[in-house]
Amino acid sequence: KSLGSINPGANSAITDISCPSGYLVAGGGPKSGYSNFTMMWNAPLNTTTWRAEANNDGTGAINVDMQIVCLAVAGLHSQVITKTLGSINSHTNSSIIDIACPSGYLIAGGGPKSGYSNFTMMWNAPLNTTTWKAEAYNDGSSAINVDVQVVCLAVSGLHSQIITKSLGSVSSGSNSPITDASCPSGYLVAGSGPNSGYSNFTLMWNAPISTSTTRSEAWNDNSSGSIFVQMQIVCLKH
């Protein structure tokens, strides 16, 4: 689903993307040829819907599409867990927060929910098969608040693997290579996200391109030098 054309300094429309009847949402993310945008909302709204909103930090109009994963298995249950990163001062990192699924549930995907723009999700990825890790950096001039919402799934016989793939060294003002990460045979892709010690980057691509593969591309808008970004992907099998 498209967020449409977004003017400089403006927010997109808040866009809800619903799964087909009988399916539960498992993850999602942006697909764009543009850099310099912040995904203010990129998270589950409820068990069947993903919500997206982007802010254009750049000097020209941009377009951002959203792609989400929906899964269906007889007896599949879902819970959406919300945890706040708290108040984040200007040019400061939030605390690193771990969000654990309830007992018996596996992590599927997650992302930020905020009324603020100009922040980087340095960590927004699975830590292990039951926990999501989040850390945000505030690129703006005043304090902000960011919540993170994750999807947890449960059904008898559900298995998970976490796949890690590096985007390599990304030079200042440059894009990383477009990088595809595929799940092992028999597994389906769910959510994904970055694991980085660096701030000030945009994930132009962080979305599924098929039922088993996620595509990632980062743009480094940090003027002080190269950065490294790793992507971590949840793969599920029943």
Region annotations inferred by a language model:
Residues 1-238:
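Extracellular attachment/recognition segments
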